[in-house]
Amino acid sequence: MKELTPEQIQENWNKLIQLVKDTFPEDYPDNRREKLLKMYHYFEERMCLTPASGKEHFHNAHPGGYVEHILHITDFVQQIHDVWSRNGATVDNFTVEELIFAALHHDLGKVGNLAEDNYIHNDSDWHRKNQGMIYKHNPRIEYMTITDRAIWILQHFGIKMTENEYLGLRLTDGLYEEANKTYYVNWSKDNQLKTNIAYILHQADMMASKIEYDQWARGDHDIKVEKEVEVQKKTEQSKAANQAFKELFGE
């Protein structure tokens, strides 16, 4: 299982908070930025350690995986938005701020409710080893879809969203969510989605999830850690050799 160091978890959290500050203006009297920061402060301790999924063969099923995934998708939505724009797609009927808002909060429900985590550690060694179920759903909280809980949390903190943001957030999971089918598969001209925000978000989410899975499957993190350990070991050996030389022959 991939593991982030405490320093990496803190660094990712700092990046997330800075992204919120950079994206949303201080628009008094309805200061959405202030409300968002209040919400993130409330969830900080838990959100920092929240995984992005419960199974290791899905994506980012490790402490800190949620924030890491959110940083990935917010990066990818901007890249994909640029690709769509350069190739002639209509992207002028929604804003980049709306795009980032939806990307930031489409999986917010994974943090759980106001008091309890959505994911708890699986206490079954058999399921962890044989099925990769690192986490399980917390039976102490009310069942909701991740999207429904995300919207509920946002309204609890008084955070308003535009129609574009709502649809983008609501539809980020694409056809993996059965309830989204009527939005994506609609034969009526009048009822088809009128902006591309949901398509861009879904592409970015798929891209982030797939890349995270590929990195886990290849063992990229383990290889990186092994290299870092090897470099550290060589550095320590070099320091020890230099110290021994000085002790034998002086400065």
Regions flagged by a language model, labelled:
Residues 1-129:
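Acidic/His-rich, divalent-metal-binding segments that scaffold phosphate/diphosphate chemistry
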Residues 2, 16, 200, 236-240:
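Generic signature of intrinsically disordered, low-complexity, basic-rich segments
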Residues 26, 30, 121, 137-139, ...:
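Intrinsically disordered, low-complexity regions enriched in small/polar residues
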Residues 59-64, 68, 80, 92-220:
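Divalent metal-dependent catalytic cores for phosphoryl transfer on phosphate-bearing substrates
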Residues 225-236:
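Acidic, proline-/serine-/threonine-rich low-complexity intrinsically disordered repeat tracts
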Residues 236-251:
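Short linear clamp-binding motif
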